[in-house]
């Protein structure tokens, strides 16, 4: 199963393309604005506007062998802890070897913004980011399918 933190996710078309190629189900989770799909392998879940509602929905369901796409580091922390494969929309993989540093850097950035030491700018999403995401996401989907085959479970 693929879970996508879909609010402001710039790689939804890429997720669909790779998921279709691998025959994997996709669940897009957002608090508004999802385009309906007729594809039986695609599910849209609209959650409340409550703080972290989409993150909580995904974290409560994602488990070992699932693939999660999110730019939200706290959600990535929760999903990595369950054994899910996690990628950001720029192709950055979050795993047990780097999630602690990613979380610390996020917290440091938040602190610097609060104290006025940083303006908190985010780089724009580039074609290179999209390409890197496609490569990373395809690799994670293959790993998820391989794990499902080894354990007899669903990807």
Curated annotation (Swiss-Prot):
InterPro entries: UPF0178. It holds the Pfam family DUF188. Belongs to the UPF0178 family. HAMAP family: UPF0178 (MF_00489). This is UPF0178 protein RHE_CH02229. The lineage of its organism: Bacteria, Pseudomonadati, Pseudomonadota, Alphaproteobacteria, Hyphomicrobiales.
């Amino acid at each position: 199963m693929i879970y996508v933190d879909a609010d402001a996710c710039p790689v939804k078309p890429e997720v669909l393309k790779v998921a279709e190629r691998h025959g994997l189900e996709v669940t897009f989770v957002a608090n508004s604005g999802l385009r309906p799909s007729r594809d039986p392998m695609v599910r849209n879940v609209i959650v409340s506007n409550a703080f972290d509602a989409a993150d909580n929905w995904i974290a409560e369901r994602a488990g070992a062998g699932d693939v999660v796409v999110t730019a939200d580091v706290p959600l990535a922390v929760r999903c990595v802890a369950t054994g899910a494969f996690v990628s950001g929309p720029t192709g950055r993989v979050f795993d047990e070897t780097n999630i602690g540093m990613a979380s610390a850097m996020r917290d440091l950035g938040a602190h610097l913004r609060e104290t006025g030491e940083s303006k908190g700018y985010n780089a724009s999403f580039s074609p290179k980011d999209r390409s890197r995401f496609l490569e990373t996401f395809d690799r994670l989907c293959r790993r998820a399918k391989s794990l499902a085959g080894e354990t007899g479970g669903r990807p």
